[in-house]
């Protein structure tokens, strides 16, 4: 049984009509950057719960979550309606293996995300530990519209902080936007446009690819890299070149 603790909302940041971030104070156990927990609310006499990744660094007591409101969802519209001072239930112990401990050494670490799945990477990069073993870091955030790139300012801050080691790139699929590539991640890899824009190759000799978000993006990218680059899924018992987390 999960141990639930009561958290208090300290901030609600509405990015768009559908995207928002919750900041919560709660007595949770220490977690590893990249992990997730569960948020819950009592609705009609039962606890409704969903898993959400931590966006904040583990050394930051402001627990931050990046969410999308599902119009007919049972929980997300209620979470979106919370105000500072409101209570929310949080599972105290985090879970998940989408962490740097599970990533083998390589020259270039590619971190590819769609939508709200940018969260785990922001936690990892804000903490900044265990990254010395990579020569290059690449963070790619794909969304439908430029307005959905909620954490671009933080991505730009991190890019400066890493002084040339971190390269960031945004992608939009439903419009063209300055500074963003247009299309979807698998197609941009297939065409070579993503690599030429970043200026680094994505291959099994130099790279490890982390994939987080839309299951279709994850599957399509894995299939493409397997077929065209001979890259394989990374398992503890059989080291490979791709680590993934589906976001629903």
Swiss-Prot record:
Enumerate the cofactors the protein uses.
Answer: FAD
Q: Does the keyword DNA damage apply?
A: no
Subcellular location(s): the record lists: Cytoplasm
Q: Gene Ontology cellular component?
A: cytosol
Residues holding NADP(+): 17, 143-144, 173-174, 184, 214-216, 220
What EC number(s) has UniProt assigned to this enzyme?
A: 1.18.1.2, 1.19.1.1
| Positions bound to FAD | 50-53, 66, 74-76, 116, 247-248
BP term (GO), one: response to xenobiotic stimulus
Q: Which residues form the signal peptide?
A: none
Per UniProt, which keywords does this protein have? Cytoplasm, FAD, Flavoprotein, NADP, Nucleotide-binding, Oxidoreductase
Q: Please list the reactions this protein catalyses.
A: 2 reduced [2Fe-2S]-[ferredoxin] + NADP(+) + H(+) = 2 oxidized [2Fe-2S]-[ferredoxin] + NADPH; reduced [flavodoxin] + NADP(+) = oxidized [flavodoxin] + NADPH + 2 H(+)
Q: What is the effect of changing residue 174 to A?
A: Increases Km for NADPH. 13-fold decrease in catalytic efficiency
Q: Which domain of life is it from?
A: Bacteria
Q: What does this protein do?
A: Transports electrons between flavodoxin or ferredoxin and NADPH. Reduces flavodoxin 1, flavodoxin 2 and ferredoxin, ferredoxin being the kinetically and thermodynamically preferred partner. Required for the activation of several enzymes such as pyruvate formate-lyase, anaerobic ribonucleotide reductase and cobalamin-dependent methionine synthase.
State the family named in the UniProt similarity comment for this chain. Answer: Belongs to the ferredoxin--NADP reductase type 1 family.
Q: How does it assemble?
A: Monomer.
Protein name in the entry: Flavodoxin/ferredoxin--NADP reductase
């Amino acid at each position: 049984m999960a141990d639930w603790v009561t958290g208090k909302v300290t901030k609600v940041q509405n990015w768009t009509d559908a995207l928002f971030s919750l900041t919560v104070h709660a007595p949770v156990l220490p977690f590893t950057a990249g992990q997730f927990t569960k948020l819950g609310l009592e609705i009609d006499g039962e606890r409704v719960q969903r898993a959400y990744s931590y966006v904040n660094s583990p050394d930051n007591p402001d627990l931050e979550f990046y969410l999308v409101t599902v119009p007919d969802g049972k929980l997300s519209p209620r979470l979106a309606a919370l105000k500072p001072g409101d209570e929310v239930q949080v599972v105290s112990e985090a879970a998940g293996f989408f962490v740097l401990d599970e990533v083998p050494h390589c020259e270039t670490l590619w971190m590819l995300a769609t939508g709200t799945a940018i969260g785990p990477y922001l936690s990892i990069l804000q903490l900044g530990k265990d990254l010395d073993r990579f020569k290059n870091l690449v963070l790619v955030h794909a969304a439908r519209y430029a307005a959905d790139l909620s954490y671009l300012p933080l991505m730009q801050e991190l890019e400066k902080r890493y002084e040339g080691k971190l390269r960031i790139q945004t992608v939009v699929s439903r419009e063209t936007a300055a500074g963003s590539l247009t299309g979807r991640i698998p197609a941009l890899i297939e065409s070579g446009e993503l690599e030429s824009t970043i200026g680094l190759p994505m291959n099994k000799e130099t790279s490890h690819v982390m994939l987080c978000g839309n299951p279709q993006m994850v599957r399509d990218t894995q299939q493409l890299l397997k077929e065209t680059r001979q890259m394989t899924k990374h398992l503890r018992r059989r080291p490979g070149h791709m680590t993934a987390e589906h976001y629903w």
